[in-house]
Amino acid sequence: MSLRWQAALLDPSLAGGWAVVHCRQQFLVDDSGVLFPRDWLKRLELPLLSEQGLGHFDGEPVFLFELDVPADVPGARWQGLRQFMQQVDPDLFRLLGYATQIGTWVSQHRFCGSCGSPMHARAGERAMYCPACGVQHYPRLSPSMIVLVTRGDELLLARSPRFAPGVYSTLAGYVEPGESVEQCVAREVREEVGVDIHPPQYIASQGWPFPHSLMLGFHAEYAGGEIVPQPEEIEDARWFHIDNLPALPARQSIARYLIELYLARRLGRPEPVLPG
């Protein structure tokens, strides 16, 4: 696994380094990229909500400038995280995904949810602290399952109304309180498409910063039942033969990895590399 990007708790009082600028799920970018000289950004007097030390990219320190409102910077524009997925290398996307999660967490914890007092970053750890009542919050992580259901040479794929036209993907959903991830897999498959599965096999995981999911990937074999798409959640679901697949999710997604991995094992091809 690449070590170009390494998360670390850096002290914002340190000088120099690079910075990414984030606001409302978008990053500032110019013709040179998304990393800006930090000292140059400081001179712009941006509407800074918080500055967070993120870690190191290619050995250089990287910081996050989380803005209160978007700012106009000559020669730069704002761009959403999903666009970067197709444009930058996986290590830089991991950095941006981490920055998104930290920035979202900071912006959503400006005030204490218990007493309403302003919250402050706690020195020495990634935490927001309320000095008035002592409540402490860490970055949020939402565990989610994603599963490829198969029946021999057939893959059960579905599409949400939110997908790009023609794209089908694997099934996914959030883990509910009190259930295991395996229980979540069986429940979500039953809810979304109405079929039963054999016990699922864990494959791999991927951080999914939209804005703070951890995708736990599984494969499950079909056990029985007819496909009945869940109203409002699933626009269409059907079995696809491996020789006649529809448009699939982006290659950087774990959904695509689960599909490509099954095809490789079924057809005796080299296995794909897990996306960062």
Curated annotation (Swiss-Prot):
Its EC number is 3.6.1.-, 3.6.1.22. It is an enzyme of class 3 (hydrolase). HAMAP family: Nudix_NudC. PROSITE patterns: NUDIX, NUDIX_BOX. One of its GO terms (biological process) is NAD catabolic process. mRNA decapping enzyme that specifically removes the nicotinamide adenine dinucleotide (NAD) cap from a subset of mRNAs by hydrolyzing the diphosphate linkage to produce nicotinamide mononucleotide (NMN) and 5' monophosphate mRNA. The NAD-cap is present at the 5'-end of some mRNAs and stabilizes RNA against 5'-processing. Has preference for mRNAs with a 5'-end purine. Catalyzes the hydrolysis of a broad range of dinucleotide pyrophosphates. This is NAD-capped RNA hydrolase NudC. GO terms for cellular component: cytosol. Residues 139-262 form the Nudix hydrolase domain. A motif (Nudix box) lies at residues 173-194. A divalent metal cation 2 binds at residue 188. One of its GO terms (molecular function) is zinc ion binding. A divalent metal cation 3 binds at residues 188, 192, 233. Substrate binds at residues 82, 125, 138, 206-213, 255. Its cofactor is Mg(2+); Mn(2+); Zn(2+). It comes from Stutzerimonas stutzeri (strain A1501). Divalent metal cations. Mg(2+) or Mn(2+). Homodimer. It catalyses: a 5'-end NAD(+)-phospho-ribonucleoside in mRNA + H2O = a 5'-end phospho-adenosine-phospho-ribonucleoside in mRNA + beta-nicotinamide D-ribonucleotide + 2 H(+); NAD(+) + H2O = beta-nicotinamide D-ribonucleotide + AMP + 2 H(+); NADH + H2O = reduced beta-nicotinamide D-ribonucleotide + AMP + 2 H(+). Keywords: Hydrolase, Magnesium, Manganese, Metal-binding, NAD, Zinc. A divalent metal cation 1 binds at residues 172, 192, 233. Belongs to the Nudix hydrolase family. NudC subfamily. The keyword NAD applies.
